[in-house]
């Protein structure tokens, strides 16, 4: 026992004396997050391949996390904050990007059905709550499955599970609570939505694993992240597959585009950590591929409008033009080798999607009052 303690002290001195520490070292020494048996079972090769961050880099990551909590999350009780971070409440961009295709399908379905303003507004509100909860559940799943990988990427090293502020067990309990709330929201929708919503759950719970064995994890994320483009129609009493499928595929390609930009933020660390993404698969061809996807996205959105009889509304056709302009402008301007610039243009997709929501809302109001 004495020998073991002495070795631990010497190891601690060597860590403190060095200006560079591994994330695993920081995590193990500060919160005893791993047992001695798990440490001894890890292979030397895995330790050697783990990226090494300076203590300054880790402190900068911690400061950026605290500075990024925002006025709402930072005012929560201290014990609640890590769980709010698990849901990414301080980064609402994901909730918006999940919600926007829902709003398109709801508004298009409302126009096709001639739904009242109160029914449409109510459904937009229900889907808003659902987007917040299920995006949070998706982030919790992602952080639970990626807790080891997150320790090897500086941007994610401060996430609640990776940093040890939330244990894996507590994260699973929290995930269960979020899933129950999400199922409660789903129960408020018509029965036609239930089987369609439940069909998305397998990929929701497994998509974080895709980055381990394929360079196209964005394909899996896009498949589940835009499910609301399908759900909004039956929620409004419409089941029009010729409209639903092209809208879903259009949203799918949009997600592929913006999440590829997101992936370019971490590509240097991803190479070292063995994490795969379209950013690494496409490399210098990324912008050309994104242009092709965006052109296809706009075409599919036009097909959805044509099949629904909504294409020639002033809002739809105008919104389509704004959508196309902003997409191609983003692709031209984004610096894929600059993480901060990638984050800026990734966030810009909120407004891009919102403008189309506003455009559909204009057509809906015009139809509601008999002008279309």
From Swiss-Prot:
Pathway where it operates: Cofactor biosynthesis; ubiquinone biosynthesis
Keyword Transmembrane helix: yes
Enzyme class: transferase
Localization per Swiss-Prot or TrEMBL: Mitochondrion inner membrane
Required co-factors: Mg(2+)
UniProt superkingdom: Eukaryota
Enzyme Commission number(s) of this protein: 2.5.1.39
Primary location: mitochondrion
A cellular component term, taken from the record's GO annotations: mitochondrial inner membrane
Gene3D superfamilies membership: UbiA prenyltransferase
Residues annotated as transmembrane: 92-112, 114-134, 171-191, 193-213, 229-249, 298-318, 352-372
Keywords: Isoprene biosynthesis, Membrane, Mitochondrion, Mitochondrion inner membrane, Transferase, Transit peptide, Transmembrane, Transmembrane helix, Ubiquinone biosynthesis
Reactions it catalyzes: an all-trans-polyprenyl diphosphate + 4-hydroxybenzoate = a 4-hydroxy-3-(all-trans-polyprenyl)benzoate + diphosphate
Transit peptide: 1-42
Similarity field: Belongs to the UbiA prenyltransferase family.
Reported function: Catalyzes the prenylation of para-hydroxybenzoate (PHB) with an all-trans polyprenyl group. Mediates the second step in the final reaction sequence of coenzyme Q (CoQ) biosynthesis, which is the condensation of the polyisoprenoid side chain with PHB, generating the first membrane-bound Q intermediate.
Protein name: 4-hydroxybenzoate polyprenyltransferase, mitochondrial
Species for this entry: Saccharomyces cerevisiae (strain ATCC 204508 / S288c) (Baker's yeast)
Lineage summary: Eukaryota, Fungi, Dikarya, Ascomycota, Saccharomycotina
Gene: COQ2
